[in-house]
Design a protein with these regions (language model features):
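ATPase catalytic-site recognition across NTP-hydrolyzing enzymes
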Residues: 1-56
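Short, amphipathic alpha-helical segments
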Residues: 3-7, 11, 166, 170, ...
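A residue-level signal for conserved active-site and pocket-lining positions in enzyme catalytic cores
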Residues: 9-13, 64, 104, 176, ...
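Mg2+-dependent endonuclease catalytic cores in nucleic-acid-processing enzymes, primarily RNase H-like
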Residues: 20, 65-195, 216-220, 224-228, ...
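A short secondary-structure junction signal
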Residues: 25, 63-66
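Beta-propeller domains
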Residues: 58-60
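Acidic, Mg2+-coordinating catalytic module of metal-dependent nucleases/exonucleases
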Residues: 196-217
Length: 236
């Protein structure tokens, strides 16, 4: 199709990483961000709260985006991922950063009580709050593939308002650029479901942001800071 042709063209003539990922969901949006110089050095605005957006992977991996709302812009200032660590580790990571936090957005599975902990089982969200990561806002998990695709569309929509710190968010940016549809080898077509790989967690945590915060606050809390800015100028 047209998108595949464009991807192959980018790959062949520009050695473009974005183009080389066939079926990448956010290729167009991330390429636009690069062209508009929105993947750059993004300073932390000290007087503005930092919101965090999480993905709690089933394979014990954890990803966190750190985002500020400044004017009409989402400033994606930091990113962290790890695996095999307990929540205390992530609470420590957050505390060691200089940020003043707003809410922490976690997917719905964070609200599920841990079965292994006996009668006094606490959910991961409750454990996080006990560790000082609070308040936690629970974001509904996509229940089916339609909801996943709606979340991908929400992420595409919000990417045009995002500025990424290219150093602190390098792994997260790579995850967004590499997040792609499964390729059906038998039929030689892209399937309608995302490939689960190393890019999934960063992309899922970003979807927590797009669905749990950006869509819900459009025209409300974020507009209190809104000011008119040209697309390629960062708010001060």
């Amino acid at each position: 199709g047209e998108e595949m042709g464009e991807a192959l063209f980018q790959q062949e003539y520009f050695c473009s990483f974005q183009g080389a990922v066939l079926g990448a969901y956010y290729a167009k949006q991330m390429l636009q961000a690069r062209r508009e110089n929105r993947i750059t050095q993004v300073p932390w605005a000290a007087g503005v709260e930092v919101y965090t957006f999480w993905d709690l992977g089933v394979d014990d991996s954890m990803t966190i985006w750190f985002i500020q709302v400044v004017g009409h812009q989402y400033r994606v200032i930091d990113y962290y991922e790890n695996s095999g660590m307990g929540l205390a580790h992530y609470a420590k990571v957050l505390k060691e950063k200089p940020y003043v936090y707003g809410d922490h957005y976690m997917p719905h599975d964070a609200a599920v009580r841990e079965m292994s902990s006996g009668e006094n089982a606490k959910s991961r969200a409750e454990v996080a709050e006990d560790l000082g990561v609070r308040p936690v806002q629970i974001v509904q998990r996509a229940r089916n593939m339609d909801a996943v695709m709606a979340g991908i569309e929400a992420s595409r929509n919000v990417l045009s308002q995002c500025w990424f710190d290219e150093t602190k968010c390098s792994k997260g940016i790579a995850a967004l650029e590499g997040y792609r549809a499964e390729y059906d080898d038998d039929k030689k077509i892209l399937s309608n479901r995302p490939l689960h790989d190393h890019c999934s967690h960063g992309a899922d945590a970003f979807r927590t942001f797009a669905v749990g915060y950006a869509e819900k606050t459009k025209g409300s809390s974020w507009s209190k800071l809104a000011r008119s800015l040209p697309k390629n100028a960062m708010a001060v």
